[in-house]
C-alpha cells in the first residue's frame, strides 16, 4: 500500500501545483504580480552578481535583504491562494468525494479516522496543514510583515530548515511504520486504507 500512497500523493501534488501556477499567472486575480516580478528581478541580480567564495556578503547587502523580504510579501497573495486551493481540494473536495482525492481514487485508497469512519473537517484541516507544510508558509508570511529584513532572513531560513526536517521525518515515519501512518496522520488521528473495488 505504501507505493499506492506515494503514487496518489504525486498525482494530487501535480494536479494542485498546476492549478495554483495557472491562477497565479493571471494578473487580474493577482494584483501584486508586477511588484513581485520587480522585486524578484532585484533579488536575482544580487544573487547573479555574488561571488560564490563570498556568499556571506549577500547577508550584508541591504538590496538583497529588502528584495528578499518583498518577494515574500508580494508573493504572499499567491501563497494564500495556494493554501486556499490546498484546503478546498484536500478538505472540501476529498470530504465530499467519499474521502478520496483524485490520486486516492485512482489507486483505490481513502482517508478514515481511527474508528474507520469519515474524518471530520477539523481532522482534514490538521492533516492538510501538516502533510503539505502549510504551517511553514503561514509562519513565514506573518513574519515577513512584522520583522526587520535581516531578522526575517535568518528566521525564514531557520523555519524552512525545520519545515524540511519535518517533511523528511514525516516520510521516514510513513516508510518504517507497519501501519503506514505518517506524522500528519498521527496528529490528525487519521489513516489511509484500501477500498474494495465495488466501493470506489
Where do the PLM segments sit?
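Short, small/hydrophobic-residue-rich motifs at membrane-helix boundaries and re-entrant hairpins
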Residues: 1-144, 157-200
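Membrane-interfacial helix-loop-helix connectors in multipass membrane proteins
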Residues: 147-157
Amino acid at each position: 500500500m505504501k507505493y499506492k500512497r506515494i503514487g496518489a500523493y504525486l498525482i494530487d501534488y501535480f494536479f494542485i501545483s498546476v492549478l495554483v501556477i495557472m491562477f497565479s499567472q493571471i494578473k487580474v486575480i493577482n494584483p501584486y504580480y508586477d511588484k513581485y516580478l520587480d522585486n524578484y528581478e532585484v533579488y536575482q541580480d544580487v544573487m547573479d552578481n555574488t561571488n560564490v567564495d563570498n556568499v556571506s556578503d549577500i547577508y550584508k547587502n541591504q538590496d538583497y535583504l529588502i528584495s528578499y523580504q518583498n518577494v515574500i510579501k508580494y508573493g504572499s497573495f499567491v501563497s494564500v491562494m495556494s493554501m486556499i486551493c490546498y484546503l478546498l481540494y484536500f478538505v472540501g473536495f476529498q470530504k465530499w468525494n467519499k474521502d478520496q482525492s483524485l490520486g486516492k481514487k485512482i489507486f483505490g485508497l481513502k482517508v478514515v479516522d481511527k474508528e474507520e469512519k469519515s474524518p471530520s473537517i477539523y481532522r482534514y484541516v490538521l492533516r492538510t496543514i501538516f502533510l503539505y507544510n502549510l504551517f511553514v508558509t503561514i509562519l513565514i508570511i506573518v513574519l515577513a510583515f512584522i520583522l526587520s529584513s535581516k531578522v526575517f532572513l535568518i528566521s525564514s531560513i531557520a523555519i524552512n530548515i525545520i519545515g524540511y526536517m519535518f517533511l523528511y521525518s514525516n516520510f521516514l515515519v510513513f516508510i518504517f511504520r507497519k501501519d503506514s501512518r505518517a506524522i500528519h496522520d498521527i496528529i490528525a488521528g487519521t489513516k489511509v486504507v484500501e477500498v474494495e473495488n465495488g466501493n470506489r
